[in-house]
Amino acid sequence: VNVRDDGYTQDRSSERVAAALGAEAGDLVVDVCAAPGGKATALAGAGAHVVAADLRPKRVRLVAGNARRTAADRPDSGAVWPLVADARHAPLRAGVADIVLVDAPCSGLGVLRRRPDARWRITANDVDELSVIQSAILDASAELVAPGGLLAYSVCTLTRSETIEVAERFADTHPGFEAVAPPEDPWIPWGSGALLLPQADDSDGMALFTWRRPLS
């Protein structure tokens, strides 16, 4: 776990996801599952403006609080606009975003070093149900990506069902989206995306897949 320059405490894996998106000043980013706000505030720190959505009002208030605290230490940061919304039905215009981040709800099996109880709480059926939700969110989020924009899917788990299989289903149903080459070391290739392994990066386990929407 690291403490960023703006004082926000965040696992290294989440920082690496935000960095891999390459957000620039003035970009419009939609983070559809934003709570507690670590990735959203990191992207705003790069100068991007971020719509930070989450399903539950309490979770969105958490994002808003973290955005206020981090912005106080970063006068040049982009705006963070909290939004209560179901990621499967976000009330946003199609093609609105330069970058859409789907940091989807998942089994959390990549964070066993911090939450070992998940080893006994999460069942195979849970993983299967989560993968259906993940695919639905990813499909809906693709509609928000502007031509030439980036769609990113990340989960703090290492199960094949929630990573490679979700990515393969998306690629099969969205042939116009082109897989982007995965980031380099310490990421390791995993299907069309990449993994961070706890033992290799001293971080949570994380998977990342990214696609580019064609210009036309």
What are these regions (language model features)?
Residues 1-216:
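S-adenosylmethionine
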